[in-house]
Each structure stands twice: as C-alpha cells, then as structure tokens.
C-alpha cells in the first residue's frame, strides 16, 4: 500500500479505515466474503492494463496471449467445478449475467415466472424497479404463509396458468434447499426454459453440499463472490447449444472489453474452490449457520421457515423483540456486527424499514469462526437487540465482539 500512501493520502486513509472496520467487526452480510490474498493480488495485477475485446483466440486487439491463458484457465476450472458444457467468465456482475440470459431466452414483454423479492427473490427476478420487471412480464411465486417454504404445487399452478417462456429459480434471502429437478419438471410441463440463479449458493454447489442446478437448467448464472469466495463478478454456465448466443450477447451485446484482471482473480478463486480445503470450509459455513439459527431460537427469536439448510438465515426481529430491521441493523452496527435489514415473507413494514434482518456465516467462517464462536455471536446479537437503549449492555456486547475478532484476525 506504500504507493497509494505516498500518492493519495485520502484514498489510502479510506482503505486503511475499511480494513480496520473489516478486521474489528464481525461481518454477517450473507452476500459478502473475504477473498484470499492470492485473489486480491491477481485482481491488482498488470492484467488491469490490458484491453481484450472478444474471446480467447478471437480478440479484436493484439497482445492478448497471456490474458487468453488466464481466461482459458478460468473457463476450464469453472467447467470442472460445476460440470458445465459451456462457461462464459466475462460478465461484470450477476445482474449482467442474468440480463444476458434474458436477452437470449426472451423477447420484450414475454412472461417469466420468478420469486417475489420480499419472499427471498432478487431484484433481477422481476422487481418492478429493476430492468427485468420493466422489460418483461414477471409473475411472482413466493413461499407458503405457514411453512415459509416454496410450495412447488403453487409454482406448478402458476406455470400452467400463465405459460411463462422462462422460469427463474434462485434467491437472495431463502434459507432452504431449492429443488431444481422439480423446477425443471414444471418448466418442461409448460414448454418453458429454466434459468437458475445460484449466486448465493455457488460455493455450496461447488463443494457438493447443495444439489447442482447445471444438470437440470438450460442456463445457470452466478456471482463469483459470496460463498464462492472470489472477486466481485459474474458467470454464466449453459448447455453447448446456447454457447454462441450467450457469448455474442455478452460481447458485443451488452459489454465491451472484459475485466481481465478480475477474470485472472476468478481463475485463482476457482482453483482454490477445487481444493479439498474448500469443501471443509463450506461444511463449516453450514454448521455455523445452523448453530447461529439454533442459538437465536433458544434466545427467543423467530427464524423464518424455522431454520436453515445453507449459509444464511432470516430473523424476524419485529415479532421477536419489537424492533424493526432498520433499527436492528443500526444497533448491531454500533457494537461491531455488520448485517442488513431485510424484508421477510408477508412483511407489513416498508422495504427500507423491514421486519427482519438477514444473517450469513461465510465471511466470519473464512476468518476461522467455528460453532462455539457462532454460539457467542448469537448470544451477543440477542443481548444487543433486547437492550438497544442500554449503554452498559451495548458496551458489554462491543467488548465481546472485540474478543472474538482479536481471536480470529483477518489476513494474518
């Protein structure tokens, strides 16, 4: 960091402050993770200098020999991780990966079946404020009011009623396994294609701890961060028959030059995910999520759907301790625990207020937190949210957070 320190003290100070925040706080945002130093080094390498429109072996610029090498490595490693016939590693984000699939599979105004955002879906699955909801006719499916789990018979009924051209299976705040085989059966019944957005669970899928959607879906999209623990970016996996359409939709359709420094970092992350240690890590992520869920339930908190099968859980704080998600987020932030307010199914609060918070275990697990540590995290959360105006209790909670972060330092 010495170059930045000497040249731009304001940016250097902000970066150092962010490092201190990450090191001294417990990160529980489910969509975040800590990349390895090798991934960071690749992303900060000379690959950032190279413009490389096109694909390996077919570039519109000279001097692409070595970015061809790293991009090809990324492609082959992603294929090996997920068993995909074709992979495009160029999407700058998960949203752009989703956009590319929509442009291939749909015409403007076509009907699509996607999960309701407030029930655990994603903005790009048809939210009216997102391009997906503006360009296409999305029909929502959600969770059952009693079980708070997806009712596949309701999904089937909606599919038969609305005859979508595409069904989107994927979530951003759903703590249960998705039945991709059942989604595919429903899609086939109505002649729809199936797209799976596995952004949140890609690491679990890569480790063999969640069913793999690749064998069922026509298209699979994901981010490369979150549980996959790579740089921020996107990825598309598809059947060979869609290769040409997907590739030309990414470039030149919606992107120009790929971010080859990010692709190099993706290659490194995919290599890490192929190691046995990665499976051990993902197993711990799930164990920690289950322990956190159980601890909070023992403390009197209601967990949406009653628990978790993956890396995250949604906590109904409004009906547990009578604070909103917004208030809970602020209280936890004040003691050094970072999370995000989140709507829960059938939420009566506005989206910027919410009745819930979403908690995820990947980031803290990366720095070494085990089940005992997450039991303590659950107790600290309970202490703070039950005493949001008690300075003595909040001071105690902050001190307990500091003991945990000191025990499991970041990047050492």
UniProtKB/Swiss-Prot annotation:
Gene3D superfamilies: Aspartate Aminotransferase, domain 1, Type I PLP-dependent aspartate aminotransferase-like (Major domain). SUPFAM superfamilies: PLP-dependent transferases. CDD domains: SHMT. (6S)-5,6,7,8-tetrahydrofolate binds at residues 117, 121-123. Its EC number is 2.1.2.1. One of its GO terms (biological process) is tetrahydrofolate interconversion. One of its GO terms (molecular function) is glycine hydroxymethyltransferase activity. The keyword Cytoplasm applies. The keyword Transferase applies. It is found in: Cytoplasm. Transmembrane segments: none annotated. It holds the Pfam family SHMT. Keywords: Amino-acid biosynthesis, Cytoplasm, One-carbon metabolism, Pyridoxal phosphate, Transferase. It comes from the Bacteria. The record marks 225 as: Plays an important role in substrate specificity. The modification N6-(pyridoxal phosphate)lysine is found at residue 226. One of its GO terms (cellular component) is cytosol. It catalyses: (6R)-5,10-methylene-5,6,7,8-tetrahydrofolate + glycine + H2O = (6S)-5,6,7,8-tetrahydrofolate + L-serine. Its cofactor is pyridoxal 5'-phosphate. Homodimer. NCBIfam families: PRK00011.1 (NF000586). This is Serine hydroxymethyltransferase. It comes from Staphylococcus haemolyticus (strain JCSC1435). The gene is glyA.
